[in-house]
Amino acid sequence: MAPRRLLLVGEGNFSFAAALSETLDQSTQLTATCLQRPAELARDPLAWENLQCLRERGIDVRFGVDCTQLADVFELHEREFDQIYFIFPHCGRKAGVAKNRELLAKFFQSCADVLAEEGEVHVALCRGQGGTPADKPQREWHNSWQVVAMAALGGLILSDVYPFSCKAVAGYKCTGYRSQDKSFHVEGALNHIFTRSLPFEGSQPRIFRIKLGNQWFSFPEPEALVGKLNRGFLEAPSCHPIKTINEKLIAELGKVFPLKRLKCSYPLLPQEGTSVLPFWNCDFLSAAFWISLHEDNSNSESLTGGTSQDVEDFLVSFSELSLLKNPGRDGKEEACEGTCGQAKICLRPSLLVHVQDVIEVPDFLSGSLHILSGPVFQKCHILPFTMPAFHETLFILGVNQNLKDGCLQSLLDHLKGILDSLLTQTLPESSKLSSLVKFVLQSNGKDYMIRVKTHNFSPDCTEDLIIGSVITSATSVIHKDQCFVFVSMNLDLLAMLVWCISDWRMLWTFDNRFLKNFVPGKIEPFKSHSLYPPCYVHDVSFWIDQKKGFDELEFHTVARAVSQDTIISIQFLSRFQHPKTQQVSLCYRLTYQTCDKALTQQQVASMQSQFRKEIQQHLYVIPR
């Protein structure tokens, strides 16, 4: 293993460097720096004593180092520091919060040039300066140093924070109060640890290629679903918590019911296939993502304008997919040739669309749980527990009419017990007194919604989450003596509840640190690698075209696409009607916040500007 490389910046009397050097093993390389020149430290006996100790230990000491220009100090071969420390940074004298924010911003940007890929930046701040909820008490945002927002300018996120203890660094003496040889209060001080964030990728969607017979077709990834297609969370090699919770659920039900797992690898549906689905909620269709397949005669290497992915097994059972036809010369339809061949399809909004295919096969096994699992996609409003893409498991049970009530009750009882067991594993014993799961009978008197209390997120959270549904059906055309029960489960919400993951977007992160939280065979509360990300708020108001109307669902979908899923809230503020023209204006408030990446105020301003352009173009509104 390569030796660790540590960098200390902004040292005053070098007492922190001297104390830290005593705790390090011989393989660790320490570089201690300060802004002052040696002559400026000549009047400080403690500084000279510490410098002498450092030199005796072979520590690299450098003077006149500006922590905001680290790339100018270290050659390329000297960089790649594993840890960079800045202990109680300040601009000196009576500098206000604005000056100290500027210092932090430039420091973090400078760190990005010399920090190792998996390195850490440690910044100790006095009580309240950081402006995060970890500070007790927490200062108002405008009166703090806004350390997390400043770190974002350097592409860094806050990954840990804990109390700074002088006792843990024996011999350290803080100094520099108002640029004097005076100490300052460090009670309640915090050490903030920052790590590199994944960068925001360009908004160019990936291009997917699929094969129909001998012909390749392509389509761009919907912008509102960037990073959501073809992730393979449920596939064999995956150790994703969504797969873990699905396997646990299936295994427990398998102790009571015989199981038959069905292959479900295609989330695309042909347009004509959506009209023959008796179990389809009409709301699904209005919220579906519709896309067009286009003939693609290029090879995958020659595609431009996006990342190409060949997904032969991923998308669709293409024997059911029909191309759009052109009228032939004899009045019959014939398929378009060349690049005019295309098909209108939608991304599957629910696994219920496959029910008909499953229950109508002649060899359907009565009394067995038939299981489908896969991703589904729906346009939706931007809300904390509503997601445009999630993984669903569908249990299909066919039973004799005479046994319906008993089998249904048995299934619900066992499912309730399994869910209660899973959902209470991360709760303290005092919270396990009552069931978290309720089956709420619907107005039709036969179907149920599966509701769960959300104590896992916060004791103050009183809203129940709907994590699934139970649908009972009449007999099928082929199996007239049977009735059917369909249990649909939102695996993403279930995983969030089990592991206390408060933000659904974290399940889709590309950051490898996410999966390191999950140990096989154990369920422990999730710890995010990005703490206290800052929020940025922007308002937008616009005149609507009253003839064309205003589609609020599409408004949310455009916001999701433009912001790359960084908008966490859209709040309707007001409606205004001009007294003379009768023209109507709407005003909304958008809140931006990421869960896993560094997001700057400048990036948000750019997104907001682009959002105004997009809604004008696609929703026929006139921004004010």
Swiss-Prot record:
PROSITE patterns: FDX_ACB
A single MF term (Gene Ontology): rRNA (uridine-N3-)-methyltransferase activity
GO cellular component, one term: cytoplasm
Pfam families: BMT5-like, FDX-ACB
One of the GO BP terms on file: rRNA base methylation
Domain FDX-ACB: 531-624
Protein name: Ferredoxin-fold anticodon-binding domain-containing protein 1
Lineage summary: Eukaryota, Metazoa, Chordata, Craniata, Vertebrata
Name of the encoding gene: FDXACB1
